[in-house]
Design a protein with these regions (language model features):
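PAS/PAS-like sensory domain cap-loop motif
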Residues: 17-22, 34-45
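N-terminal capping loop/helix in small sensory signaling domains highlighted by a polar->aromatic N-x2-3-F motif
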Residues: 27-34
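Alpha-helical sensory/transduction surfaces in regulatory modules that relay environmental signals to outputs
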Residues: 37, 44-46, 50-53, 68
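PAS-family sensory domains
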Residues: 15-18, 79-86, 88-96, 103
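PAS/LOV and related PAS-like sensory modules
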Residues: 1-18, 113-116
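Sensory coupling linkers of modular signal transduction proteins
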Residues: 98-116
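Terminal output helix/cap of sensory domains in signal transduction proteins
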Residues: 53-80
Length: 116
């Protein structure tokens, strides 16, 4: 089950405008690590749009998730998320029609091992 994974996972449904451009997404599934990362309980996330929860939504996430949904691309992003004040590594990929799955890591929490 995704609930036991040690990293954040979500399945989102993209919301498009008339020109087929992504304008938001709705959280359809999230595991407990996602709630910790987003700093919101799952019952506030699931069924709600990202834009309704985070007024400072950065469109860079939309463009990447849009590509995964519309073109079936698997993408990896490493960028700062002003919404939750964290540096993230995100892997997104198509799941169901209109949806994409995302694996998220807060890279500031990752301990890197140096080989000597």
């Amino acid at each position: 089950s995704f609930d036991q994974l040690p990293f954040a996972f979500m399945d989102i449904e993209m919301v498009f405008d008339e020109e087929k451009r992504a304008v938001d997404w709705i959280f359809r599934y999230g595991n407990p690590e996602l709630a910790r990362l987003e700093k919101l309980p799952l019952d506030r996330l699931i069924g709600n749009s990202f834009g309704s929860l985070f007024s400072n939504m950065d469109s860079k996430w939309l463009r990447s998730y849009e590509r995964a949904v519309l073109y079936g691309e698997k993408l990896e992003l490493i960028d700062y998320s002003p919404e939750i004040d964290a540096n993230l590594k995100v892997t997104c990929f198509p799941t169901f029609p209109g949806h994409c799955g995302c694996i998220l890591f807060n890279i500031s929490e990752i301990e890197f091992v140096n080989s000597r």
